[in-house]
Amino acid sequence: MQTTQETQGALERRIDMSVPMAEIDKEVDSRLKRMARTVKMPGFRPGKVPMKIVAQTYGSQARSEAIGAAVEKAFGDKVREQNLRVAGYPRIEPREAAVEGALEFSAVFEVYPQVPLGDLSGQKVERPVLTVGDAEVDKTIEVLRKQRTTFEAVDRPAQDGDRVVIDFAGRKDGELFEGGKAQDFPFVIGAGSMLKDFESAVGGLKVGETKTFEMTFPEDYHAADLAGQKVEFEITVKGVEAPILPAVDADLARALGVADGDVTKLRDEVRANLEREVKRRIQGKVKEQVMEALLVANPIEVPKALVEAESRQLAENAKRDLEMRGMNTKDIPVEPTWFADQAVRRVKLGLIMAELVNAKELYAKPEQVRAMIDEMAQSYEDPAELVRWYYAQPERLGQAEAVVIEDNVVAWVLSQTQTEDKTVTFDELMGNAA
């Protein structure tokens, strides 16, 4: 076999190969003989079909398979000889034979990039710092109370926080527009489910009162034919209900899972859950900065084949997510190209982290994996059951090991970068800051 190799770009390679036709002919004969032992044809006993008939019937198939095997072997031999790390599958291109009696072809493919690990000492990482106190516990309990709000009819004008029931009809240029009319429509004033101007118009009205008002839809309104348009609404209030929040007492504690209704235990559980969530959020924000630092310090090109494969996987994940929400993805196109930028980032990080793990021996240790699983299990009703679930299948344990490896990478990078603590508020950390 004769071969020549050339570099066509940073990661693209081309190998021209030549295989003697005599070798292929020999392989064709071998395949036909194997077929002849088992082939069945009318009028012949199994294994007794004449070779001439076998060749006439299966010759094209045998030659196609022989050529495919020869191409695969030639390419594989060359890759091993050159110690190339091939990314994706090669594109095989036939060539006009320069030598009589030879099959000539080219394999065009990509290779994995070299990943020289860069200096991280100039990179900065801010670590959020937050101690969960009584104020955070109080705020969370208040949220839990609001989630259990009940409503009671009142005889007064509607105000912020009230649930109202209305009939409404909207007109544009004197004509009803699509989606602009409803009866017995409920919503909570101030909850954000309706436009602010609409909510403001309802505020101050009592049951039985009717009001006509004008408003202008926002320029970015989702219905294009209404965006930026002035319309007129007529509304009639049919119900006004005031919110009733449950008291912080034994009943609320029991409703939130504290069997004996002890409010102190409720606060302790809320605090413990908040501390776990704060820790998770801090780790997430630090991890984001660490990954960005790795990308900045280690600029690399990535094979298109890997990016395309990752884009397809992300698109499939998005489809499954939509299906889990009850949507029919046949009517919703999800194109891999939408995820190209995300795929490039993920592939780069995957290559950089793999090199870093090998170079610095940041592999997951069994005791690390167990500690991580034990910590996760603490938020479950039956921690031991979750531990058994992870250890029941190697695939699940592999997922836990991947998380530990990622944590090891983050810890190592933090030891190499300029890290400084930054005190943040609860809302800032949770992404609720105005």
From Swiss-Prot:
Pfam families: FKBP_C, Trigger_C, Trigger_N
Segments traversing the membrane: none
All copies of domain PPIase FKBP-type, residue ranges: 161-246
HAMAP family reported in the protein's UniProt record: Trigger_factor_Tig
InterPro entries from the UniProt entry: PPIase_dom_sf, PPIase_FKBP_dom, Trig_fac, Trigger_fac_C, Trigger_fac_C_sf, Trigger_fac_ribosome-bd_bac, Trigger_fac_ribosome-bd_sf, Trigger_fact/SurA_dom_sf
Coarse class of the protein's main subcellular location: cytoplasm
PROSITE patterns: FKBP_PPIASE (PS50059)
Family: Belongs to the FKBP-type PPIase family. Tig subfamily.
Record-given protein name: Trigger factor
Enzyme Commission number(s): 5.2.1.8
Record bears the keyword Signal: no
Taxonomic lineage: Bacteria, Pseudomonadati, Pseudomonadota, Betaproteobacteria, Rhodocyclales
GO MF terms, alphabetically ordered: peptidyl-prolyl cis-trans isomerase activity; protein folding chaperone; ribosome binding
Top-level taxon in the UniProt lineage: Bacteria
Location(s) in or outside the cell: Cytoplasm
Swiss-Prot/TrEMBL keywords: Cell cycle, Cell division, Chaperone, Cytoplasm, Isomerase, Rotamase
